[in-house]
Swiss-Prot record:
Pfam families: Collagen. Residues 1-278 form a propeptide. This is Collagen alpha-1(XI) chain. It is found in: Secreted, Extracellular space, Extracellular matrix. May play an important role in fibrillogenesis by controlling lateral growth of collagen II fibrils. Keywords: Collagen, Extracellular matrix, Hydroxylation, Repeat, Secreted. Residues 279-295 are annotated as: Telopeptide. Belongs to the fibrillar collagen family. The gene is COL11A1. It comes from Bos taurus. The modification Allysine is found at residue 379. Residues 574-583 have a biased composition (Basic and acidic residues). Residues 308-317, 350-359 have a biased composition (Gly residues).
Length: 911
């Protein structure tokens, strides 16, 4: 077997050569003394289909021809270098023998005859046609052995030490398994070929010579013993498959479809760039990272279907394997050779091999994103408990189901508590100056500022236009009498004196009429949050939105109860033929067949290896042919046959309990940065800033014209009001008055653009699982499923006990060969094989419709405090407050500078 596999690539199969005795002959052969030499001789003549018989006819002419042909046929075979020469004999344990030999030999094994040329008597020595196949080791020879000496190795001392290819050992019939073609009564056994020359064996060497050529056809031999039953023929055509089984019960509903709806705001016409909002990009990034988790776990395995109906009877089974050889029958009359039979048909392919063991578990993957909890499935009916099956191998990932429909929008949750005020944001960059506003109406007069320090004297201004004459001042008191001066020239006008102290503040005038409305002031800070208004009327139903992106898969819902058992489906179409099954184990031994007719003469077998020198015995006298010996003891149990084909698939076991939750996976990769959050609430109002510094004093007015001398007159009437002077520069800002009353609420402005999306909040805790729904009605009968694959073939039954030995039959007359009998009726159906392993998990069923919406979950926990919002837009300026009360009079100012000299007084009265 080894040699065939490793040294002869053209070998068809492991050659089933049986044992050949190569040991020195002893009185008893124990089973371990029978050695096996598995050699592949490489020539087409010696295939395993021939059986070799010994019927020597000695004719002188063929000896020379035998020697000449040997060298030609086997020139390329170099026996000196073959590796099997050094192989030690092994004990017989190969798979080639149907029954290992355990019988005890009752006489010395005949390893060869003396083939010297003196023994050329041409009498026909008829040996029994004994098949030497290792099964029947009682070598009782019916013929006359007296004229044959056992071979003695006398000549090896005289021969040269390097034997040549022309020197061959004694021919021992090669022992091969008797196959069907040589025992079915269609070939007569031929005669034995001529003897070869004696072999030359050096001490300690085994040299194998090539086989000689075939001898001439001998006379017709006597009919052989009943041969053993042949090996089984190729299996017949495969029977039609049985009717398909009933469809299985409905599987559990699939996991709910994805329900994640992400609102996306697409850019309008005026947006720059691609119309992908930051929110959508963020969702895409999240979904890409969660793409692994989008495929839900495969659904649980469906319940086992009911067994299918019993199939019809199959076609006739394959022929059984070779049986044990029957007892030796009486010697039959030599029959004429029959015609050669036709070769049998090729058998059908064997069934599929068994399913392999599941592979090692792969490395643990990263933890997927937590899915949303699934809706609980409807509870089915409880199924009958099946027998515990072996755990099936993990199924392949199912195809991802189609997206479910978008569920109805949930009710709005309750408003959360108001968030804390965020920290004040950093001041933004200084904006560009706005367009100058329209001048507002003059504000109310501010409180009097403190007296500023006198400014430096301004440059002399151009003289102003002549003012209107002022009102006459009051008459001054008479001055002291001055000395009589000469009238002097009119002096140059003096410089302006400093302004006098400001007068006391007059009383406030009446309130003026309402001025035109001023420009809108800056927007005020938003007021506190109002009380939640009453619910408005429910709006009209909106149009159906676009399909949202896939949500994360939900948690696996609780397992529903088993559904009602469906009705029996229609019988499915016939399935395709299954693959070829493996060859079954050997069947029990058949009854011994009738004696076959004598076959044709077989080809000359390969000469065996030369035996060891036997002990020289005295030549015995010719004895009478003995009776057939009794059967030997029952042989030891044979080597286990090849494993039978895999049994039929057993019923599916119950579903295992739910496994423990796996460990939390590593955190996923960091998500992309979220968009800006919505603006936070405005910060608290800051404290009032300090009062600004006092403004600089205005420029000095132009000097008035010099007054004329004269007595002061009586005060005249009040002159007309002068023209209004140009508006002076604005004075310093007054102190901020108290806040005026809130103006009436203006009309609601247009809705602003929506703010940028806030960052995604942390995932809330999963809501409580919904209550279990009520049990649904059984669904309509489903369409019959596709045919499952053919089940695996059951294990073969145990081998039957060997039958009792029949009595030897009487010698029958030679009958003509009968026509072949009709095909036997099919045997009874065998018992069902043991349950096969659990089949592969079925394909995932279609995604069920979305279940009813669960009850509203409890409000989630309060989320973490959001980031501080941006500063709000400045509110509108409030209406101007009412004028404040008049301030207290200011402190007296510093003393003014000395005025210019007055005009000269009028001349006093003369006393």
């Amino acid at each position: 077997y080894d040699y065939c596999e490793h040294y002869s690539p053209x070998c068809d199969s492991s050659a089933p050569e049986a044992a050949q005795a190569q040991e020195p002959p002893v009185d008893e052969y124990a089973p371990e003394d029978i050695m096996e030499y598995d050699y592949e001789y490489g020539e087409a003549e010696y295939k395993e289909a021939e059986s070799v018989t010994e019927t020597p006819t000695v004719t002188e002419e063929t000896i020379a021809q035998t020697e000449a042909n040997i060298v030609d046929d086997f020139q390329e075979y170099n026996y000196g270098t073959e590796s099997y020469q050094t192989e030690a004999p092994r004990s017989v344990s190969g798979s080639n023998e149907p029954n290992p030999v355990e019988e005890v030999f009752t006489e010395e094994y005949l390893t060869g005859e003396d083939y010297d040329s003196q023994r050329k008597n041409s009498e026909d020595m008829l040996y029994e046609n004994k098949q030497i196949d290792g099964r029947d080791s009682d070598l009782l020879v019916d013929g006359d052995l007296g004229e044959y000496d056992f071979y003695e190795y006398k000549e090896y001392e005289d021969k040269p030490t390097s034997p040549t290819n022309e020197e061959f050992g004694p021919g021992v019939p090669a022992e091969t398994d008797i196959t069907e073609t040589s025992i079915n009564g269609h070939g007569a056994y031929g005669e034995k070929g001529q003897k070869g020359e004696p072999a030359v064996v050096e001490p300690g060497m085994l040299i194998e010579g090539p086989p000689g050529p075939a001898g001439p056809a001998g006379l017709m031999g006597p009919p052989g013993l009943q041969g053993p039953t042949g090996p089984p023929g190729d299996p017949g055509e495969r029977g039609p498959p049985g009717r398909p089984g009933l469809p299985g019960a409905d599987g559990l509903p699939g996991p709910p479809g994805t329900m994640l709806v992400l609102p996306f705001r697409y850019g309008g016409d005026s947006s720059k760039g691609p119309t992908v909002s930051a929110q959508e990009a963020q969702a895409q990034a999240i979904l890409q990272q969660a793409r692994i988790a989008l495929r839900g776990p495969p659904g649980p395995m469906g319940l086992t279907g009911r067994p299918g109906p019993v199939g019809g009877p199959g076609s006739s089974g394959a022929k059984g394997e070779m049986g044990d050889p029957g007892p030796q029958g009486p010697r039959g009359v030599q029959g004429p050779p029959g015609p050669t039979g036709k070769p049998g048909k090729r058998g059908r392919p064997g069934a599929d091999g068994g399913r392999g063991m599941p592979g090692e578990p792969g490395a643990k993957g990263d933890r997927g994103f937590d899915g949303l909890p699934g809706l609980p499935g409807d509870k089915g009916h409880r199924g009958e408990r099946g027998p515990q099956g072996p755990p099936g191998p993990p199924g392949e990932d199912g195809i991802r189901g189609e997206d479910g429909e978008i569920g109805p929008r949930g009710l709005p949750g309750e408003a959360g508590p108001r968030g804390l005020l965020g920290p004040r944001g950093t001041p933004g960059p200084i904006g560009q100056p706005g367009i100058a506003g329209v001048d507002g109406p003059p504000g109310p007069k501010g409180n009097m500022g403190p007296q500023g320090e006198p400014g430096p004297p301004g440059q002399q201004g151009n003289p102003g236009p002549q003012g209107l004459p002022g009102p006459q001042g009051p008459i001054g008191p008479p001055g002291e009498k001055g000395p009589q001066g000469k009238p002097g020239l009119a002096g140059l006008p003096g410089a302006d004196g400093p302004p006098g102290h400001p007068g006391k503040e007059g009383q406030s005038g009446e309130k003026g009429s309402l001025g035109p409305p001023g420009p809108q002031g800056p927007i005020g800070y938003p007021g506190p949050r109002g009380v939640k208004g009453a619910d408005g009327v429910r709006g009209l139903k909106g149009s159906k939105g676009e399909k949202g992106e896939d949500g994360f898969p939900g948690f696996k819902g609780d397992m529903g109860l088993k559904g009602d058992r469906g009705e029996v489906g229609q019988v499915g179409p016939r399935g395709e033929d299954g693959p070829e099954g493996p060859k079954g184990r050997a069947g029990p031994t058949g009854d011994p067949g009738p004696p076959g007719q004598a076959g044709e003469k077989g080809k000359l077998g390969v000469p065996g290896l030369p035996g060891y020198p036997g002990r020289q015995g005295p030549k015995g006298s010719t004895g009478f042919p003995g009776f057939p010996g009794a059967n030997g003891e029952k042989g030891a149990r044979g080597v286990a046959g090849k494993p039978g084909p895999r049994g039929q698939r057993g019923p599916t076991g119950p579903r295992g309990s739910r496994g423990a939750r796996g460990p939390t996976g590593k955190p996923g990769p960091k998500g992309t940065s979220g968009g800006d959050g919505p603006p936070g609430p405005p910060g608290e109002r800051g404290p009032q800033g300090p009062q600004g510094p006092v403004g600089f004093p205005g420029p000095k007015g132009p000097p008035g014209p010099p007054g004329k001398d004269g007595l002061p007159g009586h005060p005249g009437q009040r002159g007309e009001t002068g023209f209004q002077g140009k508006t002076g520069p604005p004075g310093p800002g007054g102190v901020v008055g108290p806040q005026g009353p809130t103006g009436e609420t203006g009309p609601i402005g247009e809705r602003g653009h929506p703010g940028p999306p806030g960052p995604p909040g942390e995932q809330g805790l999963p809501g409580a699982a919904g209550k279990e729904g009520a049990k649904g009605d059984p669904g309509p009968q489903g369409v019959s499923g596709k045919d499952g694959p053919a089940g695996l073939r059951g294990f073969p039954g145990e081998r039957g006990l060997p039958g009792a030995q029949g009595a030897p039959g009487l010698k029958g007359g030679e009958g003509p060969q009968g026509p072949p009998g009709p095909v036997g009726s099919p045997g009874e159906r065998g018992s069902a094989g043991t349950a096969g392993p659990i089949g592969l998990p079925g394909r995932p069923g279609p995604q069920g419709p979305p279940g009813p919406a669960g009850e509203k979950g409890a409000p989630g926990e309060k989320g973490p405090q959001g980031p501080a919002g941006r500063d709000g837009v400045q509110g509108p300026v409030g209406l101007p407050g009412p004028a404040g009360p008049a301030g207290s009079p200011g402190e007296d100012g510093d003393k003014g500078e000395i005025g210019e000299p007055g005009q000269k007084g009028s001349k006093g009265d003369k006393e």
